[in-house]
Amino acid sequence: MRCGSREVFVKIQEATNPEWGKPPSRRSAEEHIKYSLVLLDKPRGPSSHEVAAWVKKILGVERAGHAGTLDPKVSGVLPIAVAEGTKVLLALSRSDKVYVAVAKFHGDVDEGKLRAVLGEFQGIIYQRPPLRSAVKRQLRTRQVYSIELLELDGRYAVIKMHVEAGTYARKLIHDIGEVLGVGANMRELRRVAVSCYTEEETVTLQDVADAYYIWRKYGDDTYLRRVLLPIEEIARHLPKIWVRDSAVDALCNGAPLAAPGVAKFEAPFSRGELVAYFTLKGELIGVGRALVDSEEVKKMEKGLVARTDRVVMKRGTYPPLWKRRGEGAKA
């Protein structure tokens, strides 16, 4: 999880034509809804799919999709992309997560021993998905970036864990109990962060409903814009590449990003890493997979920089200059 600032490297100083596209802040309320992200605080009870369906119904859109499923009994951060924004949910598909769990041990445990055992689970661990899992039950490795004891009260413990996507917190608690020799089960779980998105930023379903009602009833979209983030926020954690106006439409048509289309970019990033394409006005075009690392991009004058995987911007938002100039289907 890279949530800190990156260095921006400018390859070419270029202005953007104000006649094409628009900064996200200048979108109409309807456009804002169509290209938005909701950082929802999912309550315990409903499934993630049910919650996403409620958001879709409240906002009157055809599609809404969530990233990182939470079981019905689990609460916390659930990113939901709305309408066109669902096209770039890939940006969050492999994001790391932070959970706070309440564990109950089946016997008395010493705090010092518990802390020592938790330390053994930091790093690469092996996990087999639970019996009720939707995925094939094959043994696999997952990274536990950190795990700490927040509180111990009798046989109950509050444990905070920062883990790789796809890690089963319930199984982790079970395995900790096995190593301690007393057994354990998870009594409660809350997700407090997804990548750079924390529970302090979340909103409730009631917030979404109220914001939409106020806009429809009174024409005031101030609250709506606070509750629904612009879809650009879905790429907050990704390295960004800003492209020249002449390259935008090619990317919208699924073309790979070539070096001449790059105006500036954030470093560092590695070959194979997911990157986000932006216009010079700050609009999210889509996401792709880097074909070279950022150090190579600094020196490149030709060749491919990234493969385009998902596109959110509508074709024709910027004119197809790449066709007029006979550059072929490369941005």
From Swiss-Prot:
Keywords: Isomerase, tRNA processing. It is an enzyme of class 5 (isomerase). Its EC number is 5.4.99.25. SUPFAM superfamilies: Pseudouridine synthase (SSF55120), PUA domain-like (SSF88697). The keyword Glycoprotein does not apply. It catalyses: uridine(55) in tRNA = pseudouridine(55) in tRNA. One of its GO terms (molecular function) is tRNA pseudouridine(55) synthase activity. InterPro entries: Dyskerin-like (IPR012960), PsdUridine_synth_cat_dom_sf (IPR020103), PsdUridine_synth_N (IPR002501), PUA (IPR002478), PUA-like_sf (IPR015947), PUA_sf (IPR036974), tRNA_PsdUridine_synth_B_fam (IPR004802), TruB_arch (IPR026326). GO terms for biological process: box H/ACA sno(s)RNA 3'-end processing; mRNA pseudouridine synthesis; rRNA pseudouridine synthesis; snRNA pseudouridine synthesis; tRNA pseudouridine synthesis. Coiled coil: none annotated. The active site is at D71 (nucleophile). Residues 238-313 form the PUA domain. Pfam families: DKCLD (PF08068), PUA (PF01472), TruB_C_2 (PF16198), TruB_N (PF01509). Could be responsible for synthesis of pseudouridine from uracil-55 in the psi GC loop of transfer RNAs. Belongs to the pseudouridine synthase TruB family. Type 2 subfamily. This is Probable tRNA pseudouridine synthase B.
